UniProtKB/Swiss-Prot annotation:
The lineage of its organism: Bacteria, Bacillati, Bacillota, Bacilli, Lactobacillales. This is Small ribosomal subunit protein bS6. One of its GO terms (cellular component) is ribosome. GO terms for biological process: translation. The gene is rpsF. Keywords: Ribonucleoprotein, Ribosomal protein, RNA-binding, rRNA-binding.
């Protein structure tokens, strides 16, 4: 299984319950499509290097995933692009 790290930035003015629901939803998208979530944790609220959608800071969330193929990652990528609460995301394949 290949190991991946997903980092996404959530808009800072989201309510705590909505943020938890968003994180749970995207974790379940990964597991429903065949990936294993090793770790999913909030990083911190950080200042952005430049404004994104009129926000100067964002809530960073890191997910470590193991997957046999890219199905789960492609679905995560597709849905995070159309979700208004996620400002940016990045998927990186980790060296074994």
């Amino acid at each position: 299984m290949a190991k991946y790290e997903i980092l996404y930035i959530i808009r800072p003015n989201i309510e705590e319950e909505a943020k938890n629901a968003l994180v749970a939803r995207f974790d379940s998208i990964l597991t429903d499509n065949g990936a294993t979530v090793v770790e999913s944790k909030d990083w911190e609220k950080r200042r952005l290097a430049y404004e994104i959608q009129d926000f100067r800071e964002g809530l960073y969330h890191v997910v470590n995933v193991e997957a046999n193929d890219a199905t789960a990652l492609n679905e995560f990528d597709r849905l995070s692009k159309i979700n208004g609460d996620i400002l940016r995301h990045m998927i990186v394949k980790l060296d074994a």
